Swiss-Prot record:
Protein's name in the database: CBS domain-containing protein CBSCBSPB2
Keyword Nucleus: no
Taxonomic lineage of the native organism: Eukaryota, Viridiplantae, Streptophyta, Embryophyta, Tracheophyta
Classification via InterPro entries: CBS_dom, CBS_dom_sf, CBS_domain-containing, PB1-like, PB1_dom
All copies of domain CBS, residue ranges: 66-124, 132-187, 228-287, 295-354
Keywords, in A-Z order: CBS domain, Membrane, Repeat, Transmembrane, Transmembrane helix
Species per Swiss-Prot/TrEMBL record: Arabidopsis thaliana
Amino acid sequence: MTTTPTSSGRRSISSIRRTSSASKKPVLQSEESESGSGSINENTSKPDSPLAQPVSDGERTVKKLRLSKALTINEGTTVFDACRRMAARRVDAVLLTDSSALLSGIVTDKDIATRVIAEGLRPEHTLVSKVMTRNPIFVTSDSLAIEALQKMVQGKFRHLPVVENGEVIALLDITKCLYDAISRMEKAAEQGSALATAVEERHWGSGNFAFIDTLRERMFKPALSTIVTENTKVALVSASDPVFVASKKMRDLRVNSVIIAVGNKIHGILTSKDILMRVVAQNLSPELTLVEKVMTPNPECASIETTILDALHIMHDGKFLHLPVFDKDGFAVACLDVLQITHAAISTVENNSSGAVNDMANTMMQKFWDSALALEPPEDYETHSDMSAMLINSEGKQSCPSQGLVSSFAFKFEDRKGRVQRFNSTGESFEELMSVVMQRCEADSGLQIMYQDDEGDKVLISRDSDLVAAVTFARSLGQKVLRLHLDFTETIAPLETIADLSEGNGGCVWWQTGVLAGAIVLTSIGLFVYLKRSKK
C-alpha cells in the first residue's frame, strides 16, 4: 500500500445524482478523464458514431435506464464559468460543444482538480477546451443497455452521453444503474420474486434459479480486504495543507480524493468535487485556502472487513461516492469510490473462475445486468427517470422530451452578411443564448432576437421564460432546430423620448422663452430712457 502525506476532506453534500455527460469518448480516453490519468488534448480526430446494433423487441435499451439531464456548454467557456454552472446544477461533469455545435469533449470534477488546480492554471483565464477529454464515446437511446453498461465498467468511467441526431439529449450515470440493479436483485432474493424465476427460466433454463443468489454471493459478499492490497494508493494530507497541495496529491497518485489524517487516523476527506464546488466555483484561491476550510470532517468510513455489498449500501444511503477504509488498528488504508468497488467486484468473479467455469465468468457481467434489469424494481423505485419517461411514450415509441429536461437545443439564424449560423445552446438561459448570438454576429448591442409562431407573427425573446416557450413551441411541431430572426436596429428609445417631450411640451417651452426675451427687451428700453433723461 502506498501512502503519501496530503490533506483532504469529504463533502457532506455529495450526492449520487452526478450527471455524467460526454459523448463520443474513446474508451481509453474516457477512463483517463474519469481517473485523471489522461494527457490533455490527446485525441483530436472526430470519432465515428456508435455501431448500430439490431435490437429485438425483448432487449432492454438505454432509454429504459435511469437517464440524467446533461449540462452542455461551449468549449470556449472558461473553467471558472464552467465550474459555476456545474455548481449551480450540482453536477460533476459537463459536455462541451465546438463552434459547429458538435459534441467535442467532456470535463469532470477530477479534470478540474488534476488538470487545472494541480497544474497551477488560473480557472478564470483557462478555457475548458484546454483541459477537456476530447471526443468521448457516446451511445444512442436505442443502444443496448447491457452493452452501454459493460462499456462503462470495462472502460472505468461513470459518465456516458446519450446522443440523438447529433444532439446530446441525456447522460447515463452507471452508479444509478448499479444501485438499481442491486436493489432489484436483493428484492428478488429476499422475496423469491416470481418474475425473477421467469426471467431465469427464459434466459438460462429452469435449473438455474439459484443464479441470482450465487451471483450476489460471488460479487458482493467478499470483504473490502479482497480489494485493498499492498499496492492500493491512498493520498494523505494534513488539515493545514493548502488545497493546491491536495490537488497535486490527487494528480500524482491518479486518485480523486485525499484523506485528512492525524497520525494516519481519519479526520476528514476532500474530493475533486469538493474542490470544484467549494473552491473553484466560489472563486477561492487554492494556494491560500486550507484543506480544513473545505473538507468534510469525520466522514463515514468502513473497516477492511466490511463486505462489498455493505460498502455500497453505506455509500448509497449516505449519498456520497467515496468511502475511506481503515484497518483493524484504525489506520487509513484506502479511499474507494463506487466505480472502483464495482469493477473490483466483477474482477473478483472472473479471477475466481478457471477452466470451463471461466466461460461463465466471461458472461457473468452480462448476466448480472440482464437479470437485474429484467427483475421487478423495488417499491420506492421510479420505473424510469424523468428523462427516460420522456423518451418513451405509452406505446413504447420514442418521443421528444418535454421542456426543461433537455439541456440544449439547436438554433440557427442568418447574420448581417447573409451567412446561416447553426449552434446548440441551452433552452433555458436567454443570457447564454444572447451571448452566443452576439459573439457569432460580432455585435455589441442593439440586437433583438425573435422567432416566428404558428400565426406567422415574430415573437420577441427577451427573458428565460420566452426562450423556454419558444423551444417548447418548436418541439411541439417536431422541429429539431428553431430558426431565430434577428433585428440589428440600434435602440431609438432615447430619441423617441426626446421627440415626445418636444411634441407634448413644446408650446410651453417656446412661450416661456418668449416671455423671457420680452422682459429683457423692456428692461433694456427702460434703462436707455433713464440714462437719456439723466443726461438732460
